[in-house]
Amino acid sequence: MISPRMTTNLLPARTISLVSNGGAATASPSSPSVAARPRRPSSGTGRGKVSAITLDDYLPMRSTEVKNRTSTDDITSLRLITAVKTPYLPDGRFDLEAYDSLINMQIEGGAEGVIVGGTTGEGHLMSWDEHIMLIGHTVNCFGSRIKVIGNTGSNSTREAVHATEQGFAVGMHAALHINPYYGKTSTEGMISHFESVLPMGPTIIYNVPSRSAQDIPPEVIVAISGYINMAGVKECIGHERIKHYADKGITIWSGNDDECHDSRWKYGATGVISVTSNLVPGLMHSLMYKGENAVLKEKLLPLMKWLFCQPNPIALNTALAQLGVARPVFRLPYVPLPLEKRAEFVRIVEAIGRENFVGQKETRVLDDDDFVLISRY
């Protein structure tokens, strides 16, 4: 039997006559080659009967209703987007109470959007069920107060399409998409990958070669910039690339906290997608909204450099635990910063002012035994 799933939506419906002769099935000359199970010969004749199989078009499991009524302009206007941390319970499950508190503190501090399940939020350590659940939870609880941008990208186009369909189905306002990593593709392959997800809703493209091991060249961004759902680019290459896109009218967010002030005020960036704003959302809001401020920039630089002394989100996880706003639980392979770096963070908080950081508890240096490392969850 031939399953309709063997066809694609590029093939018209057709009738193919399969004639069994001595148990051997052959397709009619006008039909494409079709693999079919041979029919058993009819009793007493040695010849099978002619059978007709109708192959219907492949029908995608999609609704024609609009799933996302967020306009791209609603996304391109955002100045401060936080790549939010995902906190855990001691058994490794999501700590939704702590997560909700973090989101509320982002809203109160002036963040206009959050990336859910990004690198900072450890989406790569989640199952897709966890990932989509957290996006849906964020939308249901906070979607009227802050834009929810789900990281539904993947190095597999099939996975990216499926996750993005699910993300928009549960209400996310926009999607974040990285280029295919590890199993890298060509420039044309990148364009095709992004074109597969752009029709679904507002989309931010994420260029971070230090993680993906492949730069998204400007010709890829220019090629897809005409799509109505192309919201812009989170760019980690640096100021010159940001200026290149800004000069072309393409919305661009800095992906480097230590460069975001100059990117915003000197090179044309719309704003920043930030890690640092997990800790000091109010100060990051000022950095993006209140004009050039070299004093504030220099004040925050030690914190920004500390946050990236080891691969993100190791330092952020350590910091939030020491501030008392998240449990000191790490999903492996992440482990906390060494003791001297933990002590350095306390000094940085004192220099900037505890009142500028999230949470109300006194900052303290945690001991090694305070941390819980989870390998099964």
UniProtKB/Swiss-Prot annotation:
SUPFAM superfamilies linked: Aldolase
Compartments where located: Plastid, Chloroplast
Comp. bias (Low complexity): 24-44
Keywords associated with the record: Amino-acid biosynthesis, Chloroplast, Diaminopimelate biosynthesis, Lyase, Lysine biosynthesis, Plastid, Schiff base, Transit peptide
Annotated pyruvate binding sites: T120, I273
GO cellular component: chloroplast
Cross-referenced Pfam families: DHDPS
Site, Part of a proton relay during catalysis: residue positions: T119, Y182
Signal peptide annotation: none
EC number(s) reported in the record: 4.3.3.7
GO BP, one annotated term: diaminopimelate biosynthetic process
Enzyme type, top EC level: lyase
Transit peptide residue numbers: 1-51
CDD domains with a match to the protein in the record: DHDPS
Region described as Disordered: spans on this chain: 21-50
Active site: Y206, K234
Major location category of this protein: plastid
Protein's pathway: Amino-acid biosynthesis; L-lysine biosynthesis via DAP pathway; (S)-tetrahydrodipicolinate from L-aspartate: step 3/4
GO molecular function annotations of the record: 4-hydroxy-tetrahydrodipicolinate synthase activity
Gene3D superfamilies: Aldolase class I
Family the entry assigns: Belongs to the DapA family.
NCBIfam families noted in UniProt: dapA
Functional summary from the UniProt entry: Catalyzes the condensation of (S)-aspartate-beta-semialdehyde [(S)-ASA] and pyruvate to 4-hydroxy-tetrahydrodipicolinate (HTPA).
The protein, known as: 4-hydroxy-tetrahydrodipicolinate synthase, chloroplastic
Gene: DAPA
